[in-house]
Amino acid sequence: MVVNTEKCIGCGKCTVYCPVRAISVAQRKASIDLDICTECGNCQRAAVCPKDALEKQTLEWPRQIRSQMSDVTTVYRGVNGRGTEEMKTNDITHRFKPGFAGIAVEMGRPQISSSLRDLEKMSRVLAFHGAEFEDLNPITSYIADRKTGTLDPDILDERVISGIVEAAVPIEKLRECVEAVIAASDDIDTVFSLDVISINDEDGGNEARRILDEAGIWYRPNCKNNVGLGHLN
């Protein structure tokens, strides 16, 4: 995003609509810090500029990634949004199978954002511990080597509102993966949420919960549940 300074009157109405605080006003003109801007387009969609001075610029590679990952109206490679439906549609997709656990590392949030370099740190950790990355996740499409989890080096300095690294691991590797992600969190400069996804046993038990409990790893008692209604008409 850029400001057309010939139109801008410096009213500052747009500044509060930037989720990463990239817009500032000085000498009666707004300006956008392009190092921080994630190209989400939120300032323009808010339609608060009385002079229509906020304009989308032509994005070249690798800056295009900012829009692809942060602008909710952008569809890239047939995938829109930060990630998949994860377990919410598992009764239809069968994305997560018995004997496996899903892991999702949700990085960045509005006002904070995340660099692709930090996202790569988590994808490398998961790859090292044998995780298989989700094909339909947009971050996966940027992974240059799935065996190592490394991203295309050209994109590492780009920033996005948020991104999710999605993967699945054999249930017996869950503990080491979770502990490795927690340890790696000391080396990232953003916030993140760690999700664990698993299928209940036939008796209603849950192996993933047992593993986390035995390891003394805290998790929230409330969770998302798939009750299997997706196949009903």
Task: For each feature predicted by the language model, list its residue ranges.
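Short beta-strand-to-loop capping motifs
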Residues: 107-109, 166-171
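Cofactor- and metal-binding active-site motifs of prokaryotic enzymes
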Residues: 150-158
